[in-house]
Regions:
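Active-site-proximal substrate-binding groove within the catalytic cores of carbohydrate-active enzymes
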Residues: 64, 326-335
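Acidic/aromatic-lined carbohydrate-recognition and catalytic surfaces
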Residues: 2-221, 229, 242-313
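Extended, charge-rich low-complexity interaction segments
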Residues: 309-319, 323-325
Length: 335
């Protein structure tokens, strides 16, 4: 290990790979910003250690915060009581689907990442759950609500929010953009600086965030720090494959997206070596597996093909399709 190679140097490498010549003069300041926002020492030595943070014995329960209700008690408290009573010997981790204020898409159109939806409870309830179970939270990183403070400030041309969202010209050639939804990609919006067309991969209530703007990166580093401090151990990166946009490309799985995942892994691992990143990338198998990187991106990824193949095997009594698929999978990695 090179004792002269520090966390700061690694972050600089990530940022150069993400932004290229876009912010050459400000790259040092940005590196200092993200390291400081995460509460890390820039002179900390880099340790290239890959170890298993989970295995086949890990059982994760996935639930909404209000799946279990009890009169006059906040749902997160009820959920904790319910899990303690019935599942404490069965599960090791709890994935609470978006527990933030939201406007649509069952929580995935976030109004404010820094708050717990008051109808569910508060951060003390989240911390109480994290004290007894490994807690997974969704980092809805590609987009946020069109009614969020950020987007309201974007419309007003104020901070924080100015320049936070992807825009495009309707005359641009967007024919190659990969779309998971059928709604028009661009939404016309009147702003303080004139008419703009904002990019909406999923719905017009979910406006895509502009990671070309380093302020957006800083905002999410701040959010991640808050989640870690509140006990979150597992981070589900929602719709991360769509994160970076580049005209003339499919705008999915771009190199900058992979590099942002690498940067987040570096920062998260140094803040909490036991933290885990899982990418929600519902894409073809080869592209999905690429989010492992070289043991430097996601620790784990969703295997969307497996559940329907298992059902097919059980219903048909024929395991040939499952076996063929398993033969195409690479050996399991550390992580």
């Amino acid at each position: 290990m090179d004792t002269n190679y520090h966390l700061y140097d690694r972050v600089i490498e990530h940022l150069h790979a993400i932004y290229g010549d876009q912010i050459t003069s400000g790259i040092d300041a940005l590196a200092s910003d993200v390291i400081g926002l995460m509460g890390l020492d820039p002179k900390q030595n880099v340790v290239n250690q890959v170890r298993n943070l989970w295995d086949q014995k890990e059982i994760v329960m996935i639930t909404y915060g209000d799946s279990v209700l009890q009169r006059d008690i906040k749902p997160l408290k009820t959920l904790k009581t319910f899990v303690d009573k019935y599942f404490s010997d069965s599960i090791s981790a709890l994935h609470i689907l978006p527990f933030y204020p939201f406007t649509s898409d069952d929580g995935f159109s976030v109004l404010d990442y820094s708050k717990v939806n008051e109808s569910l409870g508060d951060w003390n309830d989240i911390q109480a759950i994290a004290n007894d179970y490994s807690l997974m939270a969704d980092l809805v990183i590609n987009h946020c609500s069109a009614r969020s403070r950020w987007f309201d400030n974007f419309v007003k041309d104020q901070d924080p929010g100015r320049g936070f969202f992807v825009t495009a010209d309707p005359e641009d050639d967007l024919s190659g953009v990969v779309r998971p939804r059928l709604n028009p990609l661009l939404r016309e919006t009147q702003t303080a600086v004139g008419k703009q067309h904002v990019w909406c991969t999923f719905s017009h209530d979910q406006v895509d965030l502009n990671f070309r703007n380093p302020k957006v990166l800083n905002a999410f580093v701040t959010i991640i720090r808050q989640y870690l401090d509140s006990g979150v151990r597992l981070f589900r990166l929602d719709a991360v494959a769509f994160l970076w946009k580049e005209l003339g490309t499919p705008c999915i799985n771009l190199p900058q997206t992979h590099e942002i995942v690498r940067l987040l892994r570096t920062l998260i691992e140094y803040k909490n070596p036991n933290a885990v990143i899982i990418t929600e990338t519902n894409i073809p198998n080869r592209e999905n597996l690429a989010y492992f990187g070289n043991a430097n991106e996601a620790h784990c990824i969703y295997n969307f093909s497996l559940p329907p193949l298992l059902l097919n095997t059980l219903v048909s009594g024929d395991c040939s399709a499952l076996k063929q698929w398993m033969m195409s999978m690479p050996p399991a990695r550390h992580g």
